[in-house]
């Protein structure tokens, strides 16, 4: 999110966190960056190999915060880049409410559900006090991820770097449970 409300310390911390992630990509990783405000802007037209990270870090450091917040368009563009043959993590960061394009939370959820690969994992970070927690929580829960929230006085860069260290080398993926006919009532997290 590079909308105008991100300007200042929040945006600087987001840039630092993204710099950390880019500098810690695994050799076989592929990535892209989609910034959004009134419109969207991509680092590249398609996913790039990890050895492009240095160039991407320079690109990120040149970004500026301005404009409104088009969450729907950013999510749909990101979903369109997914390679169904590989596990995909989407890290989504915003400080606000959708104010541009599609702004209805239910429509955004429906649009993304229709566009996202079933294997996409969405991790959401909400920054500040004026965040659509219903939308962000629903997006994360519906796409095998999690949501985290940061207050303006908290260190976003530290939270994101800790988070990335946790997901960059997954121990288990594609888990499934077979209860062999047993009746179950609760499963957490759901979906697994």
Language-model features: where?
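Exposed acidic/Ser/Thr-rich ligand/metal-binding surfaces
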Residues: 2-192
